[in-house]
């Protein structure tokens, strides 16, 4: 057998092994996630979510069990990085994971696939940002931020803000829900307020409802009228989806009363009905 033939055989085996690996990898990931979902939930983690996740006690026992499984998979697959001296404790990781995983009930078993690392600052962090001033000149300014979702593999949060949101769940503001909603939106590589929808949902209906609600919010903000949705949602469709998600989970009854079509489409998307959680 010539050296060329040996090389061809080795190359063929290597290519076959790679192909088998690529084919089998999704099955391995599913097996690993199913195993994590079935594991006993740590008592220390349960204590944290019972204390820090306002709506946990309002979930059904089945939903609580499902959320626990999501949290275990999430914490296995995502890396937490403390910034500016912040120590990543169980409290930090489990609290953030519990809030973020509320968004996974809608059959999103990909677990924010673009996300690899969550950077957590002790408080608001400063970034340099290019902005246009009143004279239409672009200049660089230092801006304080509480959170940010990147289209590649990172998400940033202020732990101080996360703690504040825990204490004020029903105020309509939640940096974890907001930034992880952006992750859902960015899953297809675009940030345009249109996440990947379940098969049962229609993109045309989504677009019709979201566009109408977004334009209505823009009009009310421009005219100084009160809104259930935070005015920041009028920035662009991507921010509207993130703000609508916050409001859906934190002010569900008010959202349904004022924006029933929006509430119903988010209810179908997230497969939860937060109105049932409010007294």
Predicted regions, residues:
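Short, function-defining helix-loop hinge/capping sites that tune catalysis or transport
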Residues: 68, 186-190
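Metalloprotease/metallohydrolase-associated module, dominated by Zn2+-dependent proteases
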Residues: 95-112, 121-170, 190-279
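A metal-dependent hydrolase signature that marks the N-terminal structural subdomain at the beginning
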Residues: 28-143, 261-275
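Short, flexible segments with low predicted structural confidence
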Residues: 20-21, 38, 212-214
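Active-site recognition of the HExxH zinc-binding catalytic motif
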Residues: 60, 171-187, 242
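N-terminal signal-anchor transmembrane alpha helix of single-pass membrane proteins
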Residues: 1-33
């Amino acid at each position: 057998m010539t050296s060329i033939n040996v090389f061809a055989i080795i190359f063929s085996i290597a290519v076959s092994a790679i192909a088998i690996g690529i084919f089998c990898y999704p099955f391995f990931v599913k097996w690993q996630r199913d195993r994590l979902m079935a594991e006993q939930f740590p008592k220390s983690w349960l204590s944290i979510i019972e204390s820090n996740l306002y709506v946990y006690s309002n979930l059904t026992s089945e939903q609580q069990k499902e959320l626990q499984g999501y949290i275990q998979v999430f914490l296995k697959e995502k890396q937490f990085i403390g910034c500016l001296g912040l120590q990543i404790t169980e409290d930090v990781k489990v609290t953030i994971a519990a809030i973020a995983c509320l968004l996974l009930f809608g059959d999103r078993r990909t677990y924010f696939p673009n996300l690899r690392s969550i950077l957590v600052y002790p408080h608001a962090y400063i970034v340099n940002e290019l902005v246009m001033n009143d004279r239409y000149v672009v200049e660089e300014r230092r801006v304080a931020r509480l959170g940010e979702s990147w289209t590649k593999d990172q998400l940033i949060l202020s732990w101080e803000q996360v703690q504040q949101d825990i204490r004020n769940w029903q105020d309509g503001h939640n940096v974890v829900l907001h930034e992880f909603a952006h992750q859902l939106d960015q899953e297809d590589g675009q940030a345009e307020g249109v996440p990947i929808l379940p098969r049962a949902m229609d993109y045309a209906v989504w677009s019709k409802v979201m566009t109408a609600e977004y334009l209505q919010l823009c009009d009310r903000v421009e005219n100084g009228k009160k809104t259930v949705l935070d005015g920041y949602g009028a920035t662009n469709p991507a921010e509207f989806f993130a703000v609508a998600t916050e409001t859906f989970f934190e002010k569900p009854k008010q959202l349904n009363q004022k924006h029933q079509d929006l509430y119903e489409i988010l209810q179908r998307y997230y497969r939860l009905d937060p109105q049932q959680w409010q007294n």
